[in-house]
Amino acid sequence: MAILVPCERFDVFLSFRGKDVRESINNLNKDLDKEGINTFMDSENLMMGQDFPPALKDAIKQSCMYVIVFSKKYAESSWCLKELVQILERSRGKQLILPVFFHVPPGEEWSQKRTYEKELAEHEIEFGKRKVKKWREALTQVANMPGRHLQDGIDGDWSPGIVEHVKEMLAKIKPK
């Protein structure tokens, strides 16, 4: 039986660090669009002059599920970490999250101790320990979720597998 989740505007919110995966995400976005899956992707859906955080928060609220692409540079971005916390606060077990580990090892150790420790330590200086503690907790929570692990394949060759996974997940929660 499907759990119906209303999608106000977007089927899928794509969270990623554009600096190192934008081309791959562009391919994924095109492939999702070909399947009739409506996505939110920051470069397309944020209008010039629009306040960045409120627009992201609204897009997160208006999405049915989330694909979070963790790459080597993901935690460099405080925006990505803020998105992650917002996604977890919004989902609360009702919306689905698909973590994609792109050239990073999955699991709790990945989330902080090796891959992102330097970035998180730098963020503590700028944002304080309390905020970064929330980010660490969010990373740990998502690191322990089942997801896709991609060690090779740059560009779009991994996209079809993600698209199929998204279609399966949406079929469970979205009314036809």
What are these regions (language model features)?
Residues 1-65, 90, 163-172, 176:
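Conserved N-terminal substructure of TIR/SEFIR domains
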Residues 33-34, 52-157, 161:
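Cross-kingdom TIR/SEFIR domain
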